[in-house]
Amino acid sequence: MLDRGCPDCGFDPDYDVTSTGERARATVERWAAVLDRLGMTDRPRPGTWSPLEYACHVRDLCRVFRERLRLMLDEQDPVFADWDQDAAAVEGQYNLQDPYEVSGELAQEVRATADAFDAVTGEQWARTGRRGDGKDFTVASFAAYFLHDVEHHLRVDVRG
């Protein structure tokens, strides 16, 4: 996805990364509308998350990405702790959470993460970090990875 874009959602990784925060914030109202629908806990097919579960995932993803961004800015080439998103969904009982609470929490987390990316300047965009599986990121590529996740889940997975 970071090399050629996403054919499913149309994400182009060659966007201006300084707009990451603005674009992330632009999803908040659409996520709120998704969580206001009937059937938000319905899974479209076995093994596929419901809209509520995707919203919980994006909320938690924001927390994880914000912490990883902080590490990239504060440390030299940090290695990120693993995050098992499927285990997080089970442990957090995503599909049993209150959609109105999730909506507020998601908005807060998206905005906080957007603010964190807004604070990145100049040479900080070139700082590096790595996932436990060895995948390397710069802050710029990490921003694109984050934004793609948020926008893809909204456009493709929950049709928001």
Tell what function each PLM region has:
Residues 1-26:
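Terminal targeting/low-complexity segments that flank the catalytic cores of oxidoreductases
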Residues 1-3, 40-89, 123-160:
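Short, contiguous alpha-helical
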Residues 12-16, 50, 91-98, 134-138:
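Short amphipathic alpha-helical segments at helix-loop
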Residues 15-20, 35-38, 84, 97-98, ...:
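General structural signal for secondary-structure boundaries
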Residues 17-20, 24, 47-51, 58, ...:
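Hydrophobic alpha-helical segments and helix-packing faces
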Residues 22-49:
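A glycine-rich, hydrophobic loop/mini-helix early in the fold
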Residues 24-27, 31-34, 88-127, 146:
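Acidic/histidine-rich alpha-helical segments that form the ligand environment
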